[in-house]
């Protein structure tokens, strides 16, 4: 684990604990998702927030203006990050926090690769099968198109890969023939 991810993980875990204590897990989850999207959409704001020539107070004033509608506890957390010069970790903290929420809820994210877009029924069936396989209550599936698969699907959940693509089957046959 990289040092940055480790540091962000500690902050995310602390925020998650506070959210649980104050019964704000879902509120923080929604607000962090919106916050991350806003940071991604507005690179200039991120540059200002991470600019070393800005004082801590200037950064807090900027954050206060932009984040005025978020939960006060979450805003205080952002101020803490600014005080500790950790504002550049905010997106990673949001990701780690969401993973903790998903773990709590028994939810996992899955990427499904296919040659053509899958129907809702197919995605639902895959979700049921793989949620059971992963001991999860739900899978959030993102369908990606990958023409190189030739047919079938490849499912990626965390570090696990389930590859039932025609491309892989052909490669396996080729290896068996050569052996």
Swiss-Prot record:
Principal location listed in the UniProt entry:
membrane
* Claim: Membrane is one of the keywords in the record: yes
Report any one BP term from Gene Ontology: proton motive force-driven ATP synthesis
Superkingdom to which the source organism belongs: Bacteria
- Note the InterPro entries from the entry: ATP_synth_OSCP/delta_N_sf (IPR026015), ATPase_OSCP/dsu (IPR000711)
Matches recorded under SUPFAM superfamilies: N-terminal domain of the delta subunit of the F1F0-ATP synthase
Q: Name one molecular function that GO assigns to this entry.
A: proton-transporting ATP synthase activity, rotational mechanism
Looking at the UniProt record for this protein, which Gene Ontology cellular component terms does it annotate, in alphabetical order? plasma membrane; proton-transporting ATP synthase complex
| Places the protein is found | Cell membrane
Q: Which UniProt keywords apply?
A: ATP synthesis, Cell membrane, CF(1), Hydrogen ion transport, Ion transport, Membrane, Transport
Task: Kindly give the membrane topology term recorded for this protein.
Answer: Peripheral membrane protein
Q: What does this protein do?
A: F(1)F(0) ATP synthase produces ATP from ADP in the presence of a proton or sodium gradient. F-type ATPases consist of two structural domains, F(1) containing the extramembraneous catalytic core and F(0) containing the membrane proton channel, linked together by a central stalk and a peripheral stalk. During catalysis, ATP synthesis in the catalytic domain of F(1) is coupled via a rotary mechanism of the central stalk subunits to proton translocation. This protein is part of the stalk that links CF(0) to CF(1). It either transmits conformational changes from CF(0) to CF(1) or is implicated in proton conduction.
Q: How does it assemble?
A: F-type ATPases have 2 components, F(1) - the catalytic core - and F(0) - the membrane proton channel. F(1) has five subunits: alpha(3), beta(3), gamma(1), delta(1), epsilon(1). F(0) has three main subunits: a(1), b(2) and c(10-14). The alpha and beta chains form an alternating ring which encloses part of the gamma chain. F(1) is attached to F(0) by a central stalk formed by the gamma and epsilon chains, while a peripheral stalk is formed by the delta and b chains.
Q: Which family does it belong to?
A: Belongs to the ATPase delta chain family.
Protein name per UniProt: ATP synthase subunit delta
Q: Which gene encodes it?
A: atpH
């Amino acid at each position: 684990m990289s040092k940055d991810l480790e540091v962000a993980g500690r902050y995310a875990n602390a925020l998650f604990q506070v959210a649980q204590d104050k019964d704000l897990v879902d509120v923080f989850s929604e607000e962090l998702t919106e916050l991350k999207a806003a940071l991604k959409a507005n690179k200039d704001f991120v540059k200002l927030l991470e600019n070393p020539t800005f004082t801590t107070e200037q950064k807090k004033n900027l954050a206060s203006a932009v984040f005025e509608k978020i939960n006060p506890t979450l805003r205080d957390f952002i101020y803490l990050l600014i005080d500790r010069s950790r504002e550049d970790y905010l997106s990673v903290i949001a990701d780690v926090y969401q993973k903790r929420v998903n773990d709590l809820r028994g939810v996992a994210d899955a990427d499904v690769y296919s040659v053509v877009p899958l129907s809702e029924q197919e995605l639902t069936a895959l979700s049921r099968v793989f949620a059971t396989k992963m001991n999860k209550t739900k899978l959030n599936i993102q369908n990606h198109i990958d023409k190189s698969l030739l047919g079938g699907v490849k499912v990626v959940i965390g570090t696990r890969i389930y590859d039932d693509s025609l491309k892989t089957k052909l490669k396996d046959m080729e290896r068996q023939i050569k052996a």
